[in-house]
UniProtKB/Swiss-Prot annotation:
Protein name: Actin-related protein 1
GO cellular component: axon cytoplasm; dynactin complex
Subcellular locations according to the entry: Cytoplasm, Cytoskeleton
UniProt-listed Pfam families: Actin
Protein's UniProt keywords contain Translocase: no
Xref: Gene3D superfamilies: 3.30.420.40, Actin, Chain A, domain 4
Any single biological process term in GO: mitotic cell cycle
Source organism (scientific name): Drosophila melanogaster (Fruit fly)
A GO MF label: ATP binding
CDD domains attached to this UniProt entry: ASKHA_NBD_Arp1
UniProt keyword terms in alphabetical order: ATP-binding, Cytoplasm, Cytoskeleton, Nucleotide-binding
Family assignment from sequence similarity: Belongs to the actin family. ARP1 subfamily.
Length: 376
């Protein structure tokens, strides 16, 4: 079979986020399945016959019974740390509970964060080609796909998810590898910091399942202050959050202090750049002739850009550090939680994309070389 004939069926698009996996068929508008990228294992003894079957829970089932389970994320900062669990999750995507299809029938478009170790991509290819017999594979950078979803060919994408934040400048469809910036500060770090702040208020969330409660508190009540110093001096309105056991828990200044780590990683003792610096450095590393255009086409993507006040805060930080008359435009598409997946769905269904796939035959002939030759 020629590599070009491989792509007859609808490709499967998997946006492999550190926090949430989005998967579905190319050409559709939204991902068919979306579930947390973790595995749950029972931490108690099963004493009744006919109780919950199985020793490993994935997807909605793990979410539903999380109080019984010890929860582990197989990905940390965009890099797979536990391949056995990651492969279980990928196999589950094809099960009858999710896409209900056969692995050997569909090419796979997989997303990954830029500047990831090469080994990460090689192991993924090994699983899809050798483990589940996929006919073809392509590994694409997340930010490029987000730009596809907005219908632009020029812009700088600031993508901040659960594990990684990165900025990728793209001009007329060309990504500039030397200008890509990445920091490993993202949503999960905000959740961890919020957990610490909540502990100071007298609530201790210890277990891995309770960490998920902190995550949902973050998603519901946290916001970014345009001026954090000013915000500290005024009384923050307390928000009453109802915990799963019915207790009411009041959260005050932690609401804006937690997301602050995105702009000030030093609060966590990290020495890396804040999210606004990542964006600016990435633009400044691009060619001088392109900078003005890039500043006018900043596109936000990923769940951590959904904090209330995120766009305003980013704009005020950029204005502080740039020329007075510089025009800055930030586009925040409403569907940015899914924009990487949507871009993948558009890309994989294009006719011109067919020659980009790495076919199983190419992989068998060239091995890992094929993966690096055909992916950016």
């Amino acid at each position: 079979m020629e590599p070009y004939d491989v792509v007859v069926n609808q490709p499967v698009v998997i946006d492999n986020g550190s926090g949430v996996i989005k998967a579905g068929f190319a050409g559709e508008h939204i991902p068919k399945c979306r579930f947390p990228n973790y595995i749950g294992r029972p931490k108690h003894v099963r004493v009744m016959a006919g109780a919950l079957e199985g020793d490993i829970f994935v997807g909605p089932k793990a979410e539903e019974h999380r109080g019984l389970l010890s929860i582990r994320y197989p990905m940390e900062h965009g890099i797979v740390t536990d391949w056995n669990d990651m492969e279980r999750i990928w196999s589950y995507i094809y099960s009858k509970e999710q896409l209900a299809t056969f692995t050997e029938d569909h090419p796979v478009l997989l997303t990954e964060a830029p500047l990831n170790p090469r080994r990460n991509r090689e192991k993924a290819a090994e699983f899809f080609f050798e483990g589940i017999n996929a006919p073809a594979l392509f590994v694409s950078m997340q930010a490029v796909l987000s730009l596809y979803a907005t219908g632009r060919v020029t812009g700088v994408v600031l993508d901040s998810g659960d594990g990684v934040t990165h900025a990728v400048p793209i001009y007329e469809g060309f990504a500039m590898p030397h200008s890509i910036m990445r920091v490993d500060i993202a949503g999960r770090d905000v959740t961890r910091y919020l957990k610490t702040l909540i502990r100071r208020e007298g609530f201790n969330f210890r277990s891995t399942a309770e960490f998920e409660i902190v995550r949902s508190i973050k998603e519901k009540v946290c916001y970014l202050a345009t001026n954090p110093q000013k915000e500290e001096t005024v009384e923050t309105e307390k928000f009453a959050y109802k915990l799963p056991d019915g207790k009411i828990f009041e959260i005050g200044p932690a609401r804006f202090r937690a997301p602050e780590v995105l702009f000030r990683p030093d609060l966590l003792g990290e020495e890396c750049e804040g999210i606004h610096d990542v964006l600016m450095y990435s633009i400044e590393k691009s060619d001088m002739d392109l900078r003005k255009m890039l500043y006018q086409n900043i596109v936000l993507s990923g769940g951590s850009t959904l904090f209330k006040g995120f766009g305003d805060r980013l704009l005020s930080e950029l204005k502080k550090h740039s020329a007075k008359d510089l025009k800055i435009r930030i586009a925040a598409p409403q569907e940015r939680l899914y924009s990487t997946w949507m871009g993948g769905s558009i890309l994989a269904s294009l006719d011109t994309f067919k020659k980009m796939w790495i076919s199983k035959r190419e992989y068998e002939e060239e091995g890992q070389k094929a993966v690096h030759r055909k992916t950016f």
